Amino acid sequence: MQTHTTPMYKVLVACEYSGTVRDAFASKGHEAWSCDILPSETPGNHIQDDVLKHLDKGWDLMIAHPPCTYLSNAGARFLYPKGKLNEDRYKLGLKAKKFFIALYNAPINKICVENPISSKIFALPKYSQIIQPYEYGHPIQKRTCLWLKNLSELKPTDIIFKRQST
């Protein structure tokens, strides 16, 4: 009798210091590592460093959560306070975009980059999918974009309410 086994991956969770996603993969038998400039909040495999220095270490899968402070639509109002472009914030946004693109184009076969809806001014690549936390058992609404490479779209697993149309 043959048994089907899921292949185990060497997983990098970029821009994570909580250990939550890393530990979820580890609990399924994967060799999972988190990487962030901050120390990990929990014991486990963690690289405290700039993740860009570690993208070529033979990872099979990367889940990336790059900071969204300067890229998200929510922060767009700070780009044009009083109707004038805040050039310092714009430069920080361009730096954040460069970091995002470096993660998205990493030499890793399977990639998922997660971020909120981005400000159009930074022209990020088109996302693959938008998900909502309430589709996965969390009682909140927060449109979250996923940029996927060689991965299937996520399917809702626990829809706890439907979005109300406005």
Specify the residue positions occupied by each region the protein language model found:
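Conserved active-site and SAM-binding loop architecture
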Residues: 1-166
